[in-house]
Amino acid sequence: SMKKILALVLALAMMAVLACSAIAEQHTYHFEIVSKGFQSTYWQAVLKGTEARTKEINDEAGYEKITFQFVGPDAESNVAQQVSQFESAVNANPAAIGFAAVDQEAFVDLIAQAQSKNIPIIGFDSGVPGAPEGAVYANASTDNYAAGGVAAEGMWAKIKDRIAAAEGQVRIGEVNQEATGESVTNRGKGFIDKIIELAAAEGWGCAVIGNEYYVNGTTGAVVPEADAKIIIEVRVPSATYVDLCATEASVILNEEDTIAIFGSNQVAAEGVLVANESLYVCGSGDDEIIAVGFDSGSTIKAAVSDGTMYGAVTQAPVGIGRVLVDLLLASAEGQEVKDTDTGCAFYT
């Protein structure tokens, strides 16, 4: 009968509507992730975290809900290469962009472009300092200033008595691969300020010498070099390579009064180790230079376990990658997101 046919047509129409809405609910999101590098085990670990979290989300959804592309420059000093990678990311019109900028100035125009397209940007690791207001929705990163302080405290526990026993001045070196990226600069400043604070508690004055950016960037109270119990010498290479960091570290390791040295990221810490290969001055003994590093690549881990390097601060790069994916997805779905500290710890 006509009624039955009509009922059937309506039922079929209803099914079609339901089917369409089921398909419509299968939202897919593509993310572009522009990292600060690709070369170190650190960035590979961030990538592992993004892959693992993406797989979990897709498995849970029962379809490929998220896809991403992860790129980074050959070296962290290669600003031009990262600019073109970020430009490609913006042009791809993704649901959101993950970004760790190698430079604080170079991306202002491109970020404004992403903003005008309403593409959320999530900072990770060093994030995107100096970005226009509202462009970066949230960051997945270690609190780098605090992490520099963690490195200083770890070192201080080992050298405090030696400083007290020293007749004259002592020198603590710091090698930073650059003076532009947020993570390294904040880490470097966090270390210096914490050493100044710990020294002041013992009644010792510190002088900060070397690279101008860090000399001017300290917030702690410093004294003239001649009056200082502790000289903090900061050196920065011309580009972000291990061998160039090694050259800077050698200068510090060759100073008579050096008792400790800090390499503020994987590249700088490996530079300290390379410098030591021809000098044999670092170790864990009271007559040796106490080296402290950052990150937990295999070279640094091996040096810590054999005692060449006293200790290092480890971040959670896999955790950064995982949190990054969560923040990218939430921002793409229009949820409110906030900065997430991914933590760090000192290990010996």
Q: Where on the chain are the PLM-derived regions?
A:
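Short, Lys/Arg-enriched N-terminal segments with co-localized hydrophobic residues
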Residues: 1-2
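A residue-level marker of the well-folded mature domains of exported/periplasmic proteins
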Residues: 23-348
